[in-house]
Amino acid sequence: MVLCVQGSCPLLAVEQIGRRPLWAQSLELPGPAMQPLPTGAFPEEVTEETPVQAENEPKVLDPEGDLLCIAKTFSYLRESGWYWGSITASEARQHLQKMPEGTFLVRDSTHPSYLFTLSVKTTRGPTNVRIEYADSSFRLDSNCLSRPRILAFPDVVSLVQHYVASCAADTRSDSPDPAPTPALPMSKQDAPSDSVLPIPVATAVHLKLVQPFVRRSSARSLQHLCRLVINRLVADVDCLPLPRRMADYLRQYPFQL
C-alpha cells in the first residue's frame, strides 16, 4: 500500500516504517503535511476570560478604627454619669426595682461577646438588653427578623439619646396611636449566672427610655449640667462666641443626657 501525502516527493509508508525499530514504528508526516487549516474552515470560538469573584469575601477589618470607636464610647460614658461599670444583672435589678418606668443605666456586659448592656425598668420590672458592636457601630441586640430594622449608632450615648428622644416624642404626641417604640425580645440571660425577667423568652417588651439613673459616686458637676443645658438649647455650639477652651469642653460631650 502506498501512502500519498502532500509534498514535493511522495514517500512510501513501507520505507518510512523500515527506518525505525518495531517498538517505535509510527508514521511521521513531513512538514508540509502539518500545515494549519485555512482560517474559516472551522470557526474559532473565542471566549473572554472573566475574573471570578469570591462569593463570600471576608470583610476588611479595621482594628485601629474599632479601637478609636470603643475608646470614644468609653470616654462619653464616663462623662455621662449613668455608666455603672462592671455591676451584674442582679445588682442592676436591685437599683432599678423601685425606680419609675423608663429609668435606665448602662453597664458592662457579663457576656463575653458583648461590651455593654442597657438595664431599664419596664412595666414588667427591670430587664436587660445587650448592646452589640459591629463595623464601628452600636445597636440594640434583637432577634434575626427585626435586626435589619434596628438602627446603628457610632457610640452608645448617641444610641440611648435617640431612643430617649423617640419616647419623648411619642409621649407628647396627641395622636391616639403614637408610633410604637422598638419591640425587643427578652434577653435569655446576660450571663449563665445572671437572671432576667421570669417570663417566656419569646415575649416582646416595648423599650421605653425616659431618664438615666445617675450613679452617686459619679455625681455630675455644675459645669457638666450647664453643658447639658447648652446642648439642649443650641444645635451647633460652634456658632456661639465662646473662648476656645469653653468650646472644646462643650465638644467633649455633645449630648443632652
Curated annotation (Swiss-Prot):
Gene giving rise to this polypeptide: Cish
Domain spans labelled SH2: 82-163
Database matches in SUPFAM superfamilies: SH2 domain, SOCS box-like
Tissues expressed in: Expressed in kidney, lung and liver. Detected to a lower extent in stomach and heart.
Conditions for induction: By a subset of cytokines including interleukins 2, 3 and 6, granulocyte-macrophage colony-stimulating factor (GM-CSF) and erythropoietin (EPO).
Organism: Mus musculus
InterPro entries, alphabetized: CIS_SH2 (IPR035887), SH2 (IPR000980), SH2_dom_sf (IPR036860), SOCS_box (IPR001496), SOCS_box-like_dom_sf (IPR036036)
Subunit and interaction comment: Stably associated with the tyrosine-phosphorylated IL3 receptor beta chain and tyrosine-phosphorylated EPO receptor (EPOR).
Protein name, UniProt field: Cytokine-inducible SH2-containing protein
